Protein backbone atom coordinates (compact mmCIF):
# COMPACT_ATOMS: atom_id res chain seq x y z
CA UNK A 1 0.00 0.00 0.00
CA UNK A 2 3.06 2.23 -0.29
CA UNK A 3 3.02 5.26 1.96
CA UNK A 4 -0.77 5.20 2.21
CA UNK A 5 -1.45 4.07 5.76
CA UNK A 6 -4.55 2.12 6.77
CA UNK A 7 -5.58 1.14 10.28
CA UNK A 8 -8.13 -1.57 10.93
CA UNK A 9 -10.89 -1.04 13.48
CA UNK A 10 -13.00 -4.02 14.53
CA UNK A 11 -16.24 -3.43 16.44
CA UNK A 12 -16.07 -5.96 19.30
CA UNK A 13 -17.94 -4.28 22.13
CA UNK A 14 -21.51 -5.55 21.75
CA UNK A 15 -23.14 -7.88 24.26
CA UNK A 16 -24.46 -10.13 21.49
CA UNK A 17 -27.99 -10.29 22.90
CA UNK A 18 -29.28 -12.06 19.76
CA UNK A 19 -26.67 -14.78 20.27
CA UNK A 20 -27.79 -15.73 23.78
CA UNK A 21 -27.32 -18.10 25.53
CA UNK A 22 -23.93 -18.47 23.78
CA UNK A 23 -22.92 -14.95 24.71
CA UNK A 24 -23.54 -15.55 28.40
CA UNK A 25 -20.25 -17.46 28.14
CA UNK A 26 -18.53 -16.05 25.03
CA UNK A 27 -17.82 -12.58 23.78
CA UNK A 28 -19.76 -12.68 20.49
CA UNK A 29 -16.62 -12.27 18.39
CA UNK A 30 -15.07 -15.24 20.21
CA UNK A 31 -17.69 -17.85 19.32
CA UNK A 32 -16.04 -20.87 17.61
CA UNK A 33 -16.40 -21.07 13.83
CA UNK A 34 -15.62 -23.66 11.15
CA UNK A 35 -14.19 -27.17 11.33
CA UNK A 36 -11.19 -25.92 13.31
CA UNK A 37 -13.46 -24.08 15.76
CA UNK A 38 -11.43 -20.88 15.68
CA UNK A 39 -12.91 -17.66 17.10
CA UNK A 40 -14.84 -15.56 14.61
CA UNK A 41 -12.51 -12.65 15.35
CA UNK A 42 -9.48 -14.71 14.34
CA UNK A 43 -10.83 -14.93 10.79
CA UNK A 44 -11.34 -11.16 10.77
CA UNK A 45 -7.82 -10.38 11.98
CA UNK A 46 -6.22 -12.91 9.64
CA UNK A 47 -8.16 -11.47 6.68
CA UNK A 48 -6.86 -7.99 7.47
CA UNK A 49 -3.31 -9.29 7.78
CA UNK A 50 -3.67 -11.22 4.51
CA UNK A 51 -4.49 -7.94 2.77
CA UNK A 52 -1.67 -5.97 4.37
CA UNK A 53 -3.55 -4.25 7.20
CA UNK A 54 -1.24 -5.04 10.12
CA UNK A 55 -2.23 -2.26 12.54
CA UNK A 56 -5.60 -3.09 14.05
CA UNK A 57 -7.62 -1.51 16.86
CA UNK A 58 -10.12 -3.72 18.64
CA UNK A 59 -12.96 -1.61 20.08
CA UNK A 60 -13.96 -3.63 23.12
CA UNK A 61 -16.33 -3.62 26.07
CA UNK A 62 -18.35 -6.71 27.06
CA UNK A 63 -16.08 -9.65 28.01
CA UNK A 64 -13.06 -7.78 26.66
CA UNK A 65 -10.73 -9.98 28.71
CA UNK A 66 -11.60 -13.01 26.56
CA UNK A 67 -10.37 -11.19 23.46
CA UNK A 68 -7.29 -9.78 25.17
CA UNK A 69 -6.27 -13.12 26.68
CA UNK A 70 -6.53 -14.91 23.34
CA UNK A 71 -4.95 -12.36 20.98
CA UNK A 72 -2.59 -10.53 23.38
CA UNK A 73 -0.59 -7.96 21.36
CA UNK A 74 -1.24 -9.72 18.05
CA UNK A 75 2.33 -10.94 17.49
CA UNK A 76 1.18 -14.54 17.07
CA UNK A 77 -1.02 -13.42 14.18
CA UNK A 78 1.49 -11.08 12.56
CA UNK A 79 -0.35 -7.89 13.49
CA UNK A 80 -0.06 -5.06 16.00
CA UNK A 81 -3.19 -4.96 18.13
CA UNK A 82 -4.44 -2.04 20.18
CA UNK A 83 -7.35 -2.37 22.58
CA UNK A 84 -9.73 0.54 23.01
CA UNK A 85 -12.34 0.23 25.75
CA UNK A 86 -15.65 1.86 24.90
CA UNK A 87 -16.69 5.03 26.71
CA UNK A 88 -19.98 4.19 28.50
CA UNK A 89 -21.17 7.77 27.92
CA UNK A 90 -21.23 7.29 24.15
CA UNK A 91 -23.32 4.36 23.01
CA UNK A 92 -23.50 2.43 19.77
CA UNK A 93 -20.84 1.51 17.24
CA UNK A 94 -20.55 5.16 16.23
CA UNK A 95 -19.83 6.04 19.84
CA UNK A 96 -17.12 3.37 19.96
CA UNK A 97 -15.54 4.77 16.79
CA UNK A 98 -15.73 8.34 18.10
CA UNK A 99 -14.11 7.28 21.37
CA UNK A 100 -11.21 5.64 19.51
CA UNK A 101 -10.80 8.71 17.30
CA UNK A 102 -10.75 11.02 20.32
CA UNK A 103 -7.99 8.93 21.87
CA UNK A 104 -5.80 9.43 18.81
CA UNK A 105 -5.94 5.78 17.78
CA UNK A 106 -6.11 6.69 14.08
CA UNK A 107 -3.56 9.53 14.14
CA UNK A 108 -0.97 9.14 11.39
CA UNK A 109 -3.23 6.92 9.28
CA UNK A 110 -4.90 8.05 6.06
CA UNK A 111 -7.85 5.66 6.25
CA UNK A 112 -9.66 3.46 8.73
CA UNK A 113 -10.91 0.05 7.64
CA UNK A 114 -13.98 -0.55 9.81
CA UNK A 115 -15.18 -4.12 10.24
CA UNK A 116 -18.29 -5.24 12.10
CA UNK A 117 -17.14 -8.04 14.40
CA UNK A 118 -19.98 -10.48 13.70
CA UNK A 119 -19.36 -10.68 9.94
CA UNK A 120 -17.54 -13.48 8.12
CA UNK A 121 -16.29 -12.71 4.62
CA UNK A 122 -13.47 -13.39 2.17
CA UNK A 123 -13.89 -9.95 0.63
CA UNK A 124 -10.90 -8.66 -1.38
CA UNK A 125 -9.92 -5.87 0.99
CA UNK A 126 -6.90 -4.95 -1.15
CA UNK A 127 -9.10 -4.20 -4.15
CA UNK A 128 -11.68 -2.37 -2.06
CA UNK A 129 -9.00 -0.11 -0.56
CA UNK A 130 -7.54 0.49 -4.04
CA UNK A 131 -10.93 1.67 -5.32
CA UNK A 132 -11.39 3.79 -2.20
CA UNK A 133 -8.12 5.61 -2.92
CA UNK A 134 -8.59 5.88 -6.69
CA UNK A 135 -12.04 7.42 -6.27
CA UNK A 136 -10.75 9.68 -3.48
CA UNK A 137 -13.87 8.71 -1.55
CA UNK A 138 -14.68 9.95 1.93
CA UNK A 139 -16.11 6.49 2.60
CA UNK A 140 -16.37 3.24 0.65
CA UNK A 141 -18.92 0.60 1.66
CA UNK A 142 -18.71 -3.05 0.66
CA UNK A 143 -22.01 -4.05 -0.96
CA UNK A 144 -23.01 -7.63 -1.65
CA UNK A 145 -24.75 -8.39 -4.93
CA UNK A 146 -25.75 -11.96 -4.05
CA UNK A 147 -28.06 -11.47 -1.06
CA UNK A 148 -31.18 -13.63 -1.10
CA UNK A 149 -34.44 -12.85 0.67
CA UNK A 150 -35.05 -15.33 3.50
CA UNK A 151 -38.76 -15.79 2.71
CA UNK A 152 -40.92 -16.58 -0.31
CA UNK A 153 -41.93 -13.57 -2.43
CA UNK A 154 -45.21 -13.32 -4.36
CA UNK A 155 -46.00 -11.16 -7.37
CA UNK A 156 -49.66 -10.23 -7.46
CA UNK A 157 -52.14 -8.65 -9.85
CA UNK A 158 -54.78 -7.26 -7.53
CA UNK A 159 -55.19 -10.18 -5.15
CA UNK A 160 -54.30 -12.91 -7.66
CA UNK A 161 -50.85 -14.45 -7.27
CA UNK A 162 -49.20 -14.60 -10.70
CA UNK A 163 -45.80 -15.89 -9.58
CA UNK A 164 -44.16 -17.18 -6.44
CA UNK A 165 -40.44 -17.41 -5.78
CA UNK A 166 -38.94 -19.05 -2.71
CA UNK A 167 -36.01 -17.06 -1.26
CA UNK A 168 -35.17 -15.12 -4.44
CA UNK A 169 -32.19 -12.78 -4.92
CA UNK A 170 -33.02 -9.35 -3.52
CA UNK A 171 -31.94 -7.62 -6.72
CA UNK A 172 -30.32 -4.71 -4.87
CA UNK A 173 -26.87 -4.54 -3.25
CA UNK A 174 -26.83 -4.75 0.54
CA UNK A 175 -24.37 -3.37 3.09
CA UNK A 176 -22.26 -6.12 4.63
CA UNK A 177 -20.54 -4.36 7.53
CA UNK A 178 -17.12 -3.58 6.04
CA UNK A 179 -16.18 -0.04 5.06
CA UNK A 180 -13.19 2.25 4.55
CA UNK A 181 -13.34 5.83 5.80
CA UNK A 182 -10.94 8.72 5.40
CA UNK A 183 -9.57 9.46 8.84
CA UNK A 184 -10.20 13.19 8.44
CA UNK A 185 -13.98 12.79 8.09
CA UNK A 186 -14.29 11.02 11.45
CA UNK A 187 -14.43 14.46 13.06
CA UNK A 188 -18.02 14.69 11.80
CA UNK A 189 -18.91 12.12 14.46
CA UNK A 190 -18.37 14.91 17.00
CA UNK A 191 -21.38 16.76 15.61
CA UNK A 192 -23.58 13.70 16.02
CA UNK A 193 -22.44 12.64 19.47
CA UNK A 194 -24.78 13.15 22.41
CA UNK A 195 -24.08 11.57 25.80
CA UNK A 196 -26.20 8.47 26.54
CA UNK A 197 -27.72 8.45 23.05
CA UNK A 198 -27.15 5.73 20.47
CA UNK A 199 -24.83 6.72 17.63
CA UNK A 200 -24.83 4.33 14.67
CA UNK A 201 -22.36 4.38 11.79
CA UNK A 202 -24.81 3.26 9.09
CA UNK A 203 -27.89 5.00 10.47
CA UNK A 204 -26.38 8.38 11.35
CA UNK A 205 -22.77 8.90 10.19
CA UNK A 206 -22.84 7.64 6.58
CA UNK A 207 -26.22 9.31 5.76
CA UNK A 208 -24.82 12.64 7.02
CA UNK A 209 -21.76 12.29 4.77
CA UNK A 210 -24.07 11.71 1.80
CA UNK A 211 -26.33 14.61 2.80
CA UNK A 212 -23.34 16.96 2.92
CA UNK A 213 -22.14 15.96 -0.52
CA UNK A 214 -19.16 13.82 0.41
CA UNK A 215 -18.26 11.09 -2.06
CA UNK A 216 -19.51 7.79 -0.62
CA UNK A 217 -18.49 4.92 -2.90
CA UNK A 218 -20.08 1.49 -3.17
CA UNK A 219 -17.74 -1.47 -3.67
CA UNK A 220 -19.87 -4.17 -5.32
CA UNK A 221 -18.84 -7.74 -4.61
CA UNK A 222 -20.12 -11.28 -4.97
CA UNK A 223 -17.68 -12.50 -2.31
CA UNK A 224 -18.78 -14.91 0.41
CA UNK A 225 -20.19 -13.17 3.46
CA UNK A 226 -22.28 -14.24 6.40
CA UNK A 227 -23.79 -12.35 9.32
CA UNK A 228 -23.31 -14.51 12.42
CA UNK A 229 -25.29 -12.09 14.57
CA UNK A 230 -28.00 -14.41 15.90
CA UNK A 231 -28.24 -17.88 17.42
CA UNK A 232 -30.35 -19.05 14.48
CA UNK A 233 -27.78 -17.81 11.95
CA UNK A 234 -24.93 -19.33 13.93
CA UNK A 235 -26.63 -22.73 14.08
CA UNK A 236 -27.28 -22.65 10.32
CA UNK A 237 -23.65 -21.88 9.48
CA UNK A 238 -22.12 -24.97 7.84
CA UNK A 239 -18.51 -25.39 9.06
CA UNK A 240 -17.58 -26.95 5.72
CA UNK A 241 -18.75 -23.80 3.93
CA UNK A 242 -16.62 -21.70 6.27
CA UNK A 243 -13.53 -23.79 5.56
CA UNK A 244 -14.14 -23.70 1.82
CA UNK A 245 -14.46 -19.91 1.81
CA UNK A 246 -11.94 -18.97 4.49
CA UNK A 247 -9.66 -21.96 4.98
CA UNK A 248 -6.83 -20.16 3.16
CA UNK A 249 -6.53 -17.83 6.16
CA UNK A 250 -5.65 -20.70 8.49
CA UNK A 251 -3.27 -22.53 6.13
Where are these regions (language model features)?
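Catalytic-core segments of class I nucleotidyltransferases/pyrophosphorylases
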Residues: 113, 120, 129-133, 146-148, ...
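Active-site metal-binding loops of divalent metal-dependent hydrolases
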Residues: 15, 117-119
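Short, high-confidence coil segments that cap the C-terminus of an alpha-helix
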Residues: 53, 109, 136-137, 213-214
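Conserved N-terminal catalytic core of the sugar/cofactor nucleotidyltransferase
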Residues: 1-10, 18, 35-115, 127, ...
